């Protein structure tokens, strides 16, 4: 019997034609933990909201990063009309014929291009999604792979994404200042100025586009496996179709992030967890799919350049204590993370200097990773 095409190349799988979820895409254990609503109401599972311009923004960032590792960001000043155009262009990319998208397929070890989620290579099951990754610094050359003859789609996409990148770098710098203020480092102090300069001036950006097609059996499939982001922090722009979920303990549950028009979801990443000595913790999250509507999202990832060592800021280490984590570069940490995926361990534990001092959340969410098998 010939091998099904989606086993030879998962990108050949036709989500639109699927009437059932094949075993290649079926994940066990998706209902092991309840899902609760993270919308308003002020309950303990209401996802924190931070208004960038509010007087207590730094305090709210601190509380959210310490207790959740994520929050909804509003009042950020990125025009709503621009966000609508971004979402429209993202949807357009994934509406292209498969033969055109395959022109830009991401090869083994390549950071940019079209393909399955980058973390999919660590798992035996396939995810109900497609993605496209690019660096804003090489946007126009990268997208020529998708649109080799240029044309209106190419020009519109590049123009919109360049405008979006400019706004997001401004916002990233603003949020970095809030994070540092939340740690007690202000721009009026030498330490605060130096930290902002050292981190902000070399911070790099990567954009990942996601498409989660409607699914005939959404309780058997997963758009994106439970994971933490590896970098500093991520802005997630999601459409008004919900699907992002955050993992919380006590009791174990998934919190469904509400789809709020014009808001970004901010996720703390592992390297920021290290930079803050574990005070601001990275968050396990996943993307689920639904039966009726496609969903698109965009992740704007911030992190250090590959040659920069990331270690706990002195101001984040309690007096009389040693740093909880050793210094690592991003590539070094990704190698550790690959080993952690293979063994079911915690990458943060692997780079900790003292397991007790590290006290990271990742052991607590081990149950959330049961679907890795």
Curated annotation (Swiss-Prot):
Keywords: Dioxygenase, Iron, Metal-binding, Oxidoreductase
GO molecular function: gibberellin 3-beta-dioxygenase activity; metal ion binding
Biological process according to GO: gibberellin biosynthetic process; gibberellin metabolic process; response to light stimulus
Domain (Fe2OG dioxygenase) ranges: 203-304
Binding site for 2-oxoglutarate: 212, 295, 297
Residue sites binding Fe cation per the record: 227, 229, 285
Organism superkingdom: Eukaryota
Induction: Induced by uniconazole. Down-regulated by gibberellin (GA3).
Pathway: Plant hormone biosynthesis; gibberellin biosynthesis
SUPFAM superfamilies for the chain: Clavaminate synthase-like (SSF51197)
Free-text tissue specificity from the UniProt record: Highly expressed in elongating leaves. Expressed in unopened flowers. Expressed at low levels in leaf blades, shoots, rachis, stems and young panicles.
Iron recorded as keyword: yes
Catalytic activity: gibberellin A20 + 2-oxoglutarate + O2 = gibberellin A1 + succinate + CO2
Disulfide bonds: none
E.C. code: 1.14.11.15
Cofactor details (free text): Binds 1 Fe(2+) ion per subunit.
InterPro entries in UniProt: DIOX_N (IPR026992), IPNS-like_FE2OG_OXY (IPR044861), IPNS-like_sf (IPR027443), Iron_ascorbate_oxido_reductase (IPR050231), Oxoglu/Fe-dep_dioxygenase_dom (IPR005123)
Cofactor needs: L-ascorbate; Fe(2+)
Biological role: Catalyzes the 3-beta-hydroxylation of the inactive gibberellin precursors, leading to the formation of bioactive gibberellins. In vitro, converts the precursors GA20, GA5, GA44 and GA9 to the corresponding 3-beta-hydroxylated active products GA1, GA3, GA38 and GA4, respectively. Involved in the production of bioactive GA for vegetative growth and development. Controls the elongation of the vegetative shoot and plant height by the regulation of active gibberellin levels.
Additional observations: Plants silencing G3OX2 exhibit reduced plant height.
Family statement: Belongs to the iron/ascorbate-dependent oxidoreductase family.
Protein name: Gibberellin 3-beta-dioxygenase 2
Source species of the chain: Oryza sativa subsp. japonica
